[in-house]
Amino acid sequence: MTLPPEARGTPLGQVLRWAFRPLAFMQECRERYGDSFSVRFPGFERPMVLISDPAAIKALYMERAHGLPAGRNIVLEPVLGSRSLLLQEGAEHLARRRLMLPPFHGERMRSYEETMREIVNAEIDSWPLDREFPIHSRMQAVTLEIILRAVFGVSEGPRLDRLRGMLATVLQETASPRSQLIGLATRRFEGGGPWAKFEGQLRAADDLLYAEIAEHRERPDLEERDDILSMLMLARFEDGEAMSDTELRDQLMTLLLAGHETTATALAWTFDLLLCHQRALDRLRASLEGGEEGYLRATITESLRLRPVVPLAGRRLAKKLNADGLTLPAGTDVTPAIWLTHTCADIYPEPFAFKPERFLEDDPDTYAWIPFGGGVRRCLGASFAEFEMRIVLREILTRCDQIGRASCRERV
């Protein structure tokens, strides 16, 4: 069995294009090779196959036996820890997913609405609305406060103030493919270089998290509290065991980083799209003034289609995959190229146009709209993120009527 055709260029050239111009790189590959192709990055023992046909994606995600692709642990484990939900597989992953799911769905999730509104309105009060300012950093501030309040129950205090700064540093070093590439390249320099400095900052963040865990364990009202850390401390696996401090640290770091940066970026992209499409912005404002949220939901769905924050969500095949004319052997690393699926003209007419109305009548197909991945590894906080985006967008657009921008030029 042979893999789909491989992208042009050396492994180093491919990874540099991926790091600096990922969408242009994927679009060129689609035009040259079609719905599936392979890439080869330095340091990985085999190519990775990228797919974009929904039928192939469904076949991949429906099989629970598939594992994590190569490279995920290399990038994430030093930061999130080996027990992180994002790095667990099989029964270990499902057990942790069951314990961590409740706060991010249903009534428990909706109970955070007032807190979210308070946080975003306090943030708006600090904005210099008489001049231009970057929105992404302001969305990071909002979503970080929300996740801190959800995880710890409070967001004040000197320890959490220091933790904010530490998390910002960790994100700066790990959030983009470019920074991940630099980190991978400099880890070999023991005792010096950017990676050694980053490790010191990460240890300082760990000290703060362990101090919060220790303080929480001493709380006499632990069973009455509704914050996520208290819930995780009280949770028990099927064998009756509780999470250790090390595992709590890993899950907290996962929630604090993954639980706010992706939402902040999605919000920033949504504002970017709205401010480049005045008619859509005007229609959204009018619908919110009328107390109707259908267009708001459609706007978020369309934004996540055009600007998915996570580009890949793959698997290592545990068994042979047959789909979309492909036959791939067990052991192959396969990932949906999310943006390519989202911009397929056969699925979405005018695929590069921002048209929220395309989602007013019908929800997207499960395997043609995958900003949160899919299958048993679909993002734990997907519902929470969309809920948070609705509240933040509604509050800002209701209060701020002078939002504008100077340019809509794009570079992908």
Could you describe each region identified by the protein language model?
Residues P336-D363:
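Conserved cytochrome P450 K-helix/beta-meander segment immediately N-terminal to the heme-binding cysteine loop
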Residues M1-P4, L68-E77, E92, R108-T265:
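Cytochrome P450 heme-thiolate monooxygenase catalytic core
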Residues H216, P220-D226, R283-E293, L306-L326, ...:
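Cytochrome P450 fold signature focused on the C-terminal beta-domain
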Residues A95, P102, L312, D324, ...:
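Cytochrome P450 heme-thiolate "Cys pocket" and heme-binding signature region
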Residues T143, H260-S287, A382-C400:
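Cytochrome P450 catalytic-core helices
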Residues M1-A95, R110, E114-A122, G157-P158, ...:
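N-terminal membrane-proximal hinge/A-helix region immediately C-terminal to the signal-anchor transmembrane segment
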Residues V15-G34, D207, A211, G290-D324, ...:
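Conserved cytochrome P450 K-helix E-x-x-R motif and the immediately C-terminal K′/meander segment
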